[in-house]
Amino acid sequence: MSKLPLGPEKGPMIVAEISGNHNGSLPRALDIVRAIADTGAHAVKIQTYTADTITLNVDTPAFRISDGHELWGSRKLYDLYEEAHTPWEWHEPIFSLANELGMIAFSTPFDETAVDFLETFDVPVYKIASLEIVDLPLIKQVAETGKPMILSVGTGSIAEVAEAVAAARSGGCTDLTLLACTSSYPAQPDDA
């Protein structure tokens, strides 16, 4: 990711994820961006989706979180995503503030409409979520932007990772970083 502060001579790039920690409040989201800047992080990352673009509004076991989940047990996925998403109209103030504070701002798109939307901000890099590693059309569309791509491989098999890398390369991605990650979070304090 040559355009970003990465490389052996530069040390690690610290990316802070806002996710749904804004609790539905733009002022809180902007406060989080300021707090991230105070830590010296290089970048702020958000997620770009709506409940309608990431799941279906149905109430069946396949679309409900299991009862045993500590935080979200028995909730419908649609309701959780509706509550946790970052409204698209917030992207501009979040990205602008992050840039103003000297940080890179980028996002994880979860569908093609999100990529089209993010391109209006000329984001410098995209991250593909672990669970989207099998969404080869999304990976190819991101690759076609010509931007660097961070591909999380935490849930992928070796074959799925190979297919995702091939999709990125076929879309023209020449700046690809594979990110090994855990897809079970928040982390338990003992694991931190």
Positions of PLM-derived features:
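Catalytic cores and adjacent flexible loops of soluble metabolic enzymes
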Residues: M1-A192
